[in-house]
Amino acid sequence: GDLILSFSKLLNQKASHLPSGQYALNDEYYKRIAAIQFTMNHDDGKLVKEINKSDIILLGVSRTSKTPTSIYLANKGYKTSNIPLINENSIPKVLKDNPKITCVIGLNTEPQRLVDIRKNRMNSLKETENKFYTDLEQIKKEVNEAKNTFKKYSWPTIDVTRKSVEETAASIIKIYEIYKQDD
């Protein structure tokens, strides 16, 4: 009432009587909330039958920051699914049958970096080291298989070796924008 009127006179501006911008719940806000919910429900290969509703699908070998990157993208309003790539057989049939169903991007990394990350993961979980999971030769094979799979389906790839989640997401958004232009 009087306080708003006083400020209005002091600032020589008419009061709008609307909540400030930081509290406005607009379409953008609801879009982000929907994207976050979608992304959480489609993390780590879940609900693949709904994969066609994704704006972006991330595929990658274990420990390539698929989940944190997906969550970051969701906070920007992109409905993101992520699928672990164990081998080509782990790709959902719907994606193999229609590889351009939406913007699909492969995430890859250097094998030695993956060994280090996986060993740290095993240590942090206090699990005995799974030699298959942390073996350099096995990981080299896994990374090469992933690269070949991405190439086979003509999916763009991003090497996440020395990239932060934010940098990876920025690259993904650029690819997505190009994809939408060509769509």
Model segments located where?
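Conserved nucleotide-binding/hydrolysis micro-motifs of P-loop NTPases
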Residues: 87-89, 110-114, 164-165
